[in-house]
């Protein structure tokens, strides 16, 4: 977790990711709660987080080892959640 620039205040969830190309990047984990651990394999997309300096990537939820957000009802496709029955 890292803290955002002024005037915002929070503990934003981020992960250090080693890409297959050998680069080591910092990626943001969107949504509430996550299951990512030290050796999780994740898919990364571009897109910076404006109030987190140096964070230029997002982790894609709902693919590989990153599960979707639990109990999400709206805006589900961005968080890897199937339609509830």
Swiss-Prot record:
Any GO CC annotation of this UniProt entry: chloroplast
Gene Ontology molecular function terms on file: rRNA binding; structural constituent of ribosome
UniProt xrefs under SUPFAM superfamilies: Nucleic acid-binding proteins (SSF50249)
BP GO annotations: response to antibiotic; translation
Family annotation (InterPro entries): NA-bd_OB-fold, Ribosomal_uS12, Ribosomal_uS12_bac
Pfam families xrefs: Ribosom_S12_S23
Keywords for this protein: Antibiotic resistance, Chloroplast, Plastid, Ribonucleoprotein, Ribosomal protein, RNA-binding, rRNA-binding
Top-level taxon of origin: Eukaryota
UniProt-annotated location(s): Plastid, Chloroplast
Family of this protein: Belongs to the universal ribosomal protein uS12 family.
Assembly and interaction partners: Part of the 30S ribosomal subunit.
General function of this protein: With S4 and S5 plays an important role in translational accuracy. Located at the interface of the 30S and 50S subunits.
Name of the protein this chain belongs to: Small ribosomal subunit protein uS12c
Organism: Solanum nigrum
């Amino acid at each position: 977790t890292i803290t955002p620039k002024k005037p915002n205040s929070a503990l934003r969830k981020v992960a250090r990711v080693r890409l297959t190309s050998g680069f080591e990047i910092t990626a943001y984990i969107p949504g509430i709660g996550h299951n990512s651990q030290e050796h999780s394999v994740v898919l990364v997309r571009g897109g910076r987080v404006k109030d987190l300096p140096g964070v230029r990537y997002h982790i894609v939820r709902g693919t590989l080892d990153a599960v979707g957000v639990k109990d999400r009802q709206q805006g589900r496709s961005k968080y890897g959640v199937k339609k509830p029955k």
